[in-house]
Amino acid sequence: MRDGTATKNKINRVAMELFAEKGVTETTTKDIAAGAGIAEGTIYRHYKSKDELVKKLFLSLYEEQGNYLHEIASADKDSKQKIADMIVNFCQLFAEDKALFTFLLLTQHGQLKEVPDDMVTPVVVLRDLIAQGQDDGTIKQGDPDLMAAMVLGVVVQPAVFHVYGRLTQDYKSFTQDLTEAAWSIVGLDE
């Protein structure tokens, strides 16, 4: 008997791409089923509703990105290099899988309230890296939550501009500028 994992993965990928392209509201389960090459009812074997699909997909992808950044933050490198590596990672993944980041960017406001307190998230990883750098004296003092928000703004807002066509260059070409701006925020630009 099949376990349905391949079908669920196909549903998730097609849904993510359609949500990124058309928006969550405009995407129907019929659209997802057609894109995945399955019957619409098959979606309901995996999810109770489109809302549950959006929530679970967001949480899964958001946690996946948090875990990936946690690996970078856990490396035996200094804070400056860890922040640079995180931004390189973001720019590369955005360029390679724009649908994933578009989905996360465009659905985050409706989904962040669903994030469990104990989940490893990009925000928590960055905030903790900044706080650790402040403790060891490599990052300037200040509110680590505010600094994390500012660094994320430096990286995420250009991605939003890219999604909406205001920036059209290869996203990886922004890596150095974004890295230097992030370093400046946390006092690593010297």
What is the meaning of each model-derived region?
Residues 66, 111-136, 145-149, 176:
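Amphipathic alpha-helical packing segments from all-alpha helical-bundle domains
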Residues 56, 70-96, 147-151:
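Hydrophobic alpha-helical connector segments
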Residues 36-47:
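Short hydrophobic/aromatic patch on the recognition helix
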Residues 20, 45-48, 60:
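Base-recognition residues in the alpha-helical recognition helix of bacterial helix-turn-helix
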Residues 79, 92, 124-136, 168-190:
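C-terminal peripheral helix-coil segments that are non-catalytic and often amphipathic
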Residues 59-66:
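Short, basic, alpha-helical segments at the C-terminal edge of helix-turn-helix-like DNA-binding modules
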Residues 1-22, 26-35, 52-55:
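Basic, helix-initiating cap at the start of DNA-binding domains
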Residues 102-106, 135-181:
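Hydrophobic/aromatic-rich alpha-helical bundle segments in the mid-to-C-terminal region
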